Swiss-Prot record:
InterPro entries: IGPD_sf, ImidazoleglycerolP_deHydtase, ImidazoleglycerP_deHydtase_CS, Ribosomal_Su5_D2-typ_SF. Pathway: Amino-acid biosynthesis; L-histidine biosynthesis; L-histidine from 5-phospho-alpha-D-ribose 1-diphosphate: step 6/9. Pfam families: IGPD. This is Imidazoleglycerol-phosphate dehydratase. It comes from Synechococcus sp. (strain JA-3-3Ab).
Amino acid sequence: MTALNSTCSLQPRTAFVQRRTAETDVQVRLSLDGKGQHEIDTGIPFLDHMLAQLSTHGLIDLQIKAVGDLHIDDHHTNEDVGIALGQALAQALQDRRGIYRFGHFWAPLDEALVQVVLDFSGRPHLSYGLELTVERIGRYETQLVREFYQAVANHAQMTLHIRQAAGLNAHHIVEASFKAFARALRMAVERDPRRQDGIPSSKGVL
């Protein structure tokens, strides 16, 4: 590895995104090469808990602050946090040079078992297979889980497959999915020492 490549590889991979609309004001700051430290306040307690799993198990330092129209419902804030997080991931990865690109992980949580497979392909896609038989976890509407993942996949420009192999408790299923997502994400964004600063695509661009 040349000195230039070595220097490029060690550049900090950080991002700051602010998304401000008539409905929400969301700020996301992250470091992909962190220790899992986090400060998260979206105003939605269950989403905060899930994002803490993402930070802890993905070793992503993550600060998120969101103020939204929660007096209406959680939909706008949930989606806009996903959008801003996806944009922050894309910003931190830039042209995706030197990463493994693909990631996969199976995560159990008691009776629940969920697999996540992802690809920073530049082609947004979500294949979502969680089977949640209740409408809410606490106050959090379970249909918002899919909306969150769709927003992240779209704006991080990743292909994201989420599959449930087992599970009865909705909280366990969703939390297992976030833990699996965290570990798959960690695998995909790790620097590949053999690839150095090359683009992980035969096309030469992602």
